[in-house]
């Protein structure tokens, strides 16, 4: 069983958005594309994706970068989108009026999105040196 503590060596920046009016399934579809990317790459990907979930997620990434800059004095260019979670929130229950006095239930789902960013440190950078990249070895972030 894994420990619940933080295993990353660098500082950790956190941003949380609660009660976002979209389903968690639709938000996870976008989140899976930006997990493990740098700050700039994540914003470029979100701008080009044709999903409505991209806007609140890009706002949250901007908020995490602002938290890093204000609270820890870190540069936005050195940030990495680390752990990202999308959890289901409360379901808003509404009634759709139908014929002959009936009403059909409508469920409007919400979700909570948490982004934990990390600073890219030069000593822990998993990308290999230029000589090894010329040989064809390229490491990928997990």
Swiss-Prot record:
Listed InterPro entries: Ribosomal_uL22, Ribosomal_uL22_bac/chlpt-type, Ribosomal_uL22_bac/org-type, Ribosomal_uL22_sf
Subcellular localization, as worded in the UniProt entry: Plastid, Chloroplast
Residue spans crossing the bilayer: none
Annotated CDD domains: Ribosomal_L22 (cd00336)
This protein's record includes keyword Isomerase: no
One annotated GO molecular function: structural constituent of ribosome
Listed GO biological process terms: translation
SUPFAM superfamilies according to UniProt: Ribosomal protein L22 (SSF54843)
Any Pfam family the entry gives: Ribosomal_L22
GO CC aspect terms: chloroplast; large ribosomal subunit
Keywords: Chloroplast, Plastid, Ribonucleoprotein, Ribosomal protein, RNA-binding, rRNA-binding
Similarity remark: Belongs to the universal ribosomal protein uL22 family.
Quaternary assembly: Part of the 50S ribosomal subunit.
Function noted in UniProt: This protein binds specifically to 23S rRNA. The globular domain of the protein is located near the polypeptide exit tunnel on the outside of the subunit, while an extended beta-hairpin is found that lines the wall of the exit tunnel in the center of the 70S ribosome.
Name of the protein in question: Large ribosomal subunit protein uL22c
Lineage of the species this protein comes from: Eukaryota, Viridiplantae, Streptophyta, Embryophyta, Tracheophyta
Gene from which this protein is expressed: rpl22
């Amino acid at each position: 069983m894994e420990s619940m503590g933080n295993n990353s060596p660098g500082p950790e920046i956190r941003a949380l958005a609660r009660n976002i009016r979209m389903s968690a399934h639709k938000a996870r579809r976008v989140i899976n594309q930006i997990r493990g990317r740098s700050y700039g790459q994540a914003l470029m990907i979100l701008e080009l994706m044709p999903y409505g979930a991209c806007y609140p997620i890009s706002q949250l990434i901007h908020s995490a970068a602002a938290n890093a800059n204000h609270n820890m004095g870190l540069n936005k260019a050195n940030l990495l989108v680390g752990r990202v979670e999308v959890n289901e929130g409360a379901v808003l229950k509404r009634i759709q009026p139908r014929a002959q006095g009936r009403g059909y239930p409508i469920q409007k789902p919400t979700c909570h999105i948490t982004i934990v960013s990390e600073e890219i440190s030069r000593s822990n950078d998993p990308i290999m040196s230029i000589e090894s990249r010329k040989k064809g070895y390229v490491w990928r972030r997990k």
